[in-house]
């Protein structure tokens, strides 16, 4: 078996080997996650070509309305208001 000799890391110990594997795995996941979030950014381009690139189309925001319906539940006993 290949033996690695480092003064500060002894990979022949099971705990240190697990630690190094976990550290490398977490580093890989962190770095690959950073590239994925860069690709997932929303480009703020208008859907209307007359307005141009990187401009918010205000018509979209004016058409989006949030409606909150009143609750159908009754108030409990003893509650006022």
Curated annotation (Swiss-Prot):
A motif (SCOOP motif) lies at residues 65-79. A motif (SxS motif essential for MIK2 binding) lies at residues 71-73. Its main location: membrane. It is found in: Cell membrane; Secreted, Extracellular space, Apoplast. GO terms for molecular function: LRR domain binding; receptor serine/threonine kinase binding. GO terms for cellular component: apoplast; plasma membrane. Residues 1-40 form the signal peptide. Belongs to the serine rich endogenous peptide (SCOOP) phytocytokine family. Interacts with MIK2 (via extracellular leucine-rich repeat domain); this interaction triggers the formation of complex between MIK2 and the BAK1/SERK3 and SERK4 coreceptors, and subsequent BAK1 activation by phosphorylation. This is Serine rich endogenous peptide 21. It comes from Arabidopsis thaliana (Mouse-ear cress).
